[in-house]
Amino acid sequence: MARVTVEDCIDKVESPYELVLVAKERAVQLNSGLEPTLDRDNDKNTVISLREIAADTIKVSDLTDSAIHKLRKHVEQVDDGTDDDEIIGDDFESMYKGEISKSGTPILPSKRARKIPEKIQVSSDDLEELTAKAEPEVDVDAELEVGDEETAVSLDQIAEAETEAETTEVNSDDSETTNS
């Protein structure tokens, strides 16, 4: 076959759209490393997939199922018929210790585990290292630490100074408006 056309493949599928879907799926399989059923003949994977469909070396139904399976968001699980719930049992009663919150609802084990604080074990070497780091490395003069009473200003004094400044601004604004 020198050249593959849609007419060569259209009798193998129901519509040209399905042909595109099936050929694309086979090209993806070839890109992922599957070996082609025909000789490559220096062709690209899309051409090889069309040649395989035209020559019936690959089943179209398998490619359709593969494409549909990949596009599904929820893959159906095969149930073997055994009921696992009865074998495992209900562990809620064994885990629940009977604690009840203030609102009257039971406290589940996962909630209790979050409320219990984790105890941290610290060695004595770590404590010594932390206390050594907590001490300041810079010497501070005692005179600078204790403020003079003359320079100490309370918040009330600052608030009074701000209100005085505002009233003087308002008075100066009033005098400017009357002068003009």
Curated annotation (Swiss-Prot):
Region (Disordered): 100-180
NCBIfam families, per database record: rpoZ
Family statement: Belongs to the RNA polymerase subunit omega family.
Acidic residues bias locations: 137-151, 159-180
InterPro entries to which the protein is assigned, alphabetical: DNA-dir_RNA_pol_omega, Pol_omega/Rpo6/RPB6, RPB6/omega-like_sf
Catalytic activity: RNA(n) + a ribonucleoside 5'-triphosphate = RNA(n+1) + diphosphate
Keywords per UniProt: DNA-directed RNA polymerase, Nucleotidyltransferase, Transcription, Transferase
Molecular function via GO: DNA binding; DNA-directed RNA polymerase activity
Subunit details: The RNAP catalytic core consists of 2 alpha, 1 beta, 1 beta' and 1 omega subunit. When a sigma factor is associated with the core the holoenzyme is formed, which can initiate transcription.
PANTHER family noted in UniProt: DNA-DIRECTED RNA POLYMERASE SUBUNIT OMEGA
Classification via SUPFAM superfamilies: RPB6/omega subunit-like (SSF63562)
Signal peptide: none
Function: Promotes RNA polymerase assembly. Latches the N- and C-terminal regions of the beta' subunit thereby facilitating its interaction with the beta and alpha subunits.
One GO BP: DNA-templated transcription
SMART domains hit by this protein: RNA_pol_Rpb6
Gene3D superfamilies: 3.90.940.10
GO CC terms: DNA-directed RNA polymerase complex
Underlying gene: rpoZ
Top-level division of the source organism's lineage: Bacteria
Protein name: DNA-directed RNA polymerase subunit omega
Known EC number: 2.7.7.6
